[in-house]
Amino acid sequence: MALWGGRFTQAADQRFKQFNDSLRFDYRLAEQDIVGSVAWSKALVTVGVLTADEQRQLEEALNVLLEEVRANPQQILQSDAEDIHSWVEGKLIDKVGQLGKKLHTGRSRNDQVATDLKLWCKETVRELLTANRQLQSALVETAQANQDAVMPGYTHLQRAQPVTFAHWCLAYVEMLARDESRLQDTLKRLDVSPLGCGALAGTAYEIDREQLAGWLGFTSATRNSLDSVSDRDHVLELLSDAAIGMVHLSRFAEDLIFFNSGEAGFVELSDRVTSGSSLMPQKKNPDALELIRGKCGRVQGALTGMMMTLKGLPLAYNKDMQEDKEGLFDALDTWLDCLHMAALVLDGIQVKRPRCQDAAQQGYANATELADYLVAKGVPFREAHHIVGEAVVEAIRQGKPLEALPLADLQKFSRVIGDDVYPILSLQSCLDKRAAKGGVSPQQVAQAIDDARARLAL
């Protein structure tokens, strides 16, 4: 049943109907549409449109429909209804007859869908926050177990300075904490109810919109009806949150793909998150991580697409805004799936400490320590930098690490170098010296783990 047929003398072309209908994706708003309708029925009692008995009948029928939807949401897709609003209204009329036709009094699909989508977004944000914190917790637990796993840190994908696997884990905890904060900020801004704003100019019934917002669990009602039915900032914000969050997960995946490679060999991924080759029997491919990395692009695309859709729209509602849902649903589903999969990857990961240690001892990752040693001896840093560069060239020529060069060879580059240089060049010394807040020293890493555990209530 179309909700707008009286104005028309011809039926819609079937091709247009298929093009126009949105039930195939907005069926996901069924529960929110029913919950919003229950609240609206209560508001109609306050302005005399419904009696208390009529409202009770409507609410009982809507609650029965809600249970039916929860038991079998796929039933909705068997309908020929235009959208989820017309499906719910049609089912309600089937249950209570003509009384069901009174429910839409004073309400437009414009404020109705805006309300439904905000309710869905609120619920989904809570799911994302839970999954985000679960992944943070998994990273903290992995860090706790690998505080002594020394490995090379990289810049330009070249070995730079020694770090620990724990410090690497904690870097992603920080990224995820920012993702969490962004979601919480987004939730604050979307937590206002547009219901009661009508098509664009407000409802003609003196409904207490603040009370109505409270019934639906919103903190308040929106302030301007024209903005309320046009607003999709929360869609853009959530897509932006997802895009940034997926960039973090993609970088996480890329790091672990490299760490798992034969060239690095720092970690071994569980059989539960890898697959084999149909031709090469020796292969163990990091498919879970590659899919996380690959899915990042579709989320970025959803954000870009929605921004382009909205940029040229005049106020208030336009049918273009129907395009807000498919990209949003897919992007947030994808982000949620990837958060869960990243946690599963960590659940079975094995860090190969000896290989990590060997790699950290190669590539002259202690060169900065020698420069700092010279600075402590009174050599200006820029000069010390040049001296160490020459020493590295000599070490490469001899095929030795810096700490294996004889003192006499080191003193060719600076007479201030003494026997006390060798303890400074050890990996442990490199770590211990990074003791400022946020550094890689064992004390700082342990403190960061404690702080994260306290914040996450682990």
From Swiss-Prot:
Lineage: Bacteria, Pseudomonadati, Pseudomonadota, Gammaproteobacteria, Enterobacterales
Localization in the cell: Cytoplasm
Protein's name according to its UniProt entry: Argininosuccinate lyase
Gene source species: Salmonella paratyphi B (strain ATCC BAA-1250 / SPB7)
Molecular-function annotations in GO: argininosuccinate lyase activity
Alphabetized CDD domains for the sequence: Argininosuccinate_lyase (cd01359)
Keyword Amino-acid biosynthesis part of the UniProt annotation: yes
GO cellular component terms listed in the entry, alphabetical order: cytosol
Record key words, sorted: Amino-acid biosynthesis, Arginine biosynthesis, Cytoplasm, Lyase
Gene3D superfamilies, alphabetized: Fumarase/aspartase (C-terminal domain), Fumarase/aspartase (Central domain), Fumarase/aspartase (N-terminal domain)
Pathway connected to this protein: Amino-acid biosynthesis; L-arginine biosynthesis; L-arginine from L-ornithine and carbamoyl phosphate: step 3/3
Record gene name: argH
